[in-house]
């Protein structure tokens, strides 16, 4: 009897950490990234193999991501591996990820102000450079600012509703946030298509399109995060006390909002010299 109890005790986990089972996805994702990189290099250098390697690598990377994250969802939702200790580690990882994103945009702002505060002679010693017609900050950029700030409000309401257990309102305000995000991206695309300058037009065009383009990319990533959260809410994966992934997506979205405010004030408003 004692031996049986000892064997049963050994089958229980006596620590709060998640010891991940062997998984093929780290190796699969590494190989997929290698194929994607090689395919991209061959494509850029005109090799015919790049026409196959680049899309194949992209498909394999996306497949590895989806299958890996599927397993993470299973471990958290169905197997109960995400204890308080595990969630603390995930939270710390998300915070460090967001800090790294902030530092990325810090470098982009540094490049912008380095070029604009003391314009070189080649630029005409003025900012915007001679020959550049900047965008009117009170047209599409201002509308996009209002849209993004509104999305920050709707996602905050959605977060409050999931905490209070109002599932219907949570879904409604989350859908509104996603729609506002797509409106922002659509208007950003219209702005790019109709811009009177290109990325090749001096350092002004370079800093403008790189900074706003990277922000647009992060809006797309945040929209994907929110869409996945919506799918998980519809699938009854998230509850009022268990929605760390959704909270992480909301933190990310608020950071994207704040970065846009800095972009609007510095690049669109101050940088246009209105």
UniProtKB/Swiss-Prot annotation:
EC number: 7.1.1.9
Entry's transmembrane regions: 22-42, 47-67, 93-113, 137-157, 170-190, 208-228, 248-268
Cellular compartments per GO CC: mitochondrial inner membrane
Domain of life: Eukaryota
Subcellular location: Mitochondrion inner membrane
Key words of the record: Membrane, Mitochondrion, Mitochondrion inner membrane, Translocase, Transmembrane, Transmembrane helix
Pfam families linked to this entry: COX3 (PF00510)
Membrane topology designation: Multi-pass membrane protein
SUPFAM superfamilies: Cytochrome c oxidase subunit III-like
UniProt-listed GO biological process terms: mitochondrial electron transport, cytochrome c to oxygen
GO molecular function: cytochrome-c oxidase activity
Family: Belongs to the cytochrome c oxidase subunit 3 family.
Quaternary structure and interacting proteins, as annotated: Component of the cytochrome c oxidase (complex IV, CIV), a multisubunit enzyme composed of a catalytic core of 3 subunits and several supernumerary subunits. The complex exists as a monomer or a dimer and forms supercomplexes (SCs) in the inner mitochondrial membrane with ubiquinol-cytochrome c oxidoreductase (cytochrome b-c1 complex, complex III, CIII).
Function: Component of the cytochrome c oxidase, the last enzyme in the mitochondrial electron transport chain which drives oxidative phosphorylation. The respiratory chain contains 3 multisubunit complexes succinate dehydrogenase (complex II, CII), ubiquinol-cytochrome c oxidoreductase (cytochrome b-c1 complex, complex III, CIII) and cytochrome c oxidase (complex IV, CIV), that cooperate to transfer electrons derived from NADH and succinate to molecular oxygen, creating an electrochemical gradient over the inner membrane that drives transmembrane transport and the ATP synthase.
Name of the protein: Cytochrome c oxidase subunit 3
Organism: Allomyces macrogynus
Gene name tied to this protein: COX3
């Amino acid at each position: 009897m004692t031996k049986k109890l000892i064997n049963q005790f050994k089958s229980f986990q006596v620590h709060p950490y998640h010891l991940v089972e062997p998984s093929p996805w780290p190796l699969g994702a590494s190989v997929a990234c290698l194929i994607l990189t090689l395919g991209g290099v061959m494509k850029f250098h005109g090799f015919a193999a790049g026409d196959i390697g680049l899309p194949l690598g992209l498909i394999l990377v996306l497949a590895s991501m989806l299958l890996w994250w599927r397993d993470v969802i299973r471990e958290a939702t169905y197997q109960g591996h995400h204890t308080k200790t595990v969630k603390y580690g995930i939270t710390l990882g998300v915070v460090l990820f967001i800090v790294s994103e902030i530092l990325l945009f810090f470098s982009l702002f540094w490049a912008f102000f380095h070029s604009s505060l003391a314009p070189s002679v080649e630029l005409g010693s003025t900012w915007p450079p001679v020959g550049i017609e900047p965008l009117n900050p009170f047209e599409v950029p201002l509308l996009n600012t209002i849209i993004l700030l509104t999305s920050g409000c709707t996602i905050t309401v959605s977060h409050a509703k999931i905490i209070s257990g109002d599932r219907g309102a949570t879904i409604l305000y989350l859908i509104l946030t996603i729609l506002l995000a797509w409106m922002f991206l659509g208007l950003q695309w219209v702005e790019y298509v109709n811009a009177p300058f290109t990325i090749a037009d001096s350092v002004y065009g370079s800093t403008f399109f790189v900074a706003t383009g990277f922000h647009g990319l992060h809006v797309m990533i945040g929209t994907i995060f929110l869409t996945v959260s919506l799918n998980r809410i519809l699938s009854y994966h998230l509850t009022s006390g268990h929605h760390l992934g959704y909270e992480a997506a909301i933190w990310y979205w608020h950071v994207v909002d704040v970065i846009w405010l800095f972009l609007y004030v510095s690049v669109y408003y101050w940088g246009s010299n209105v």
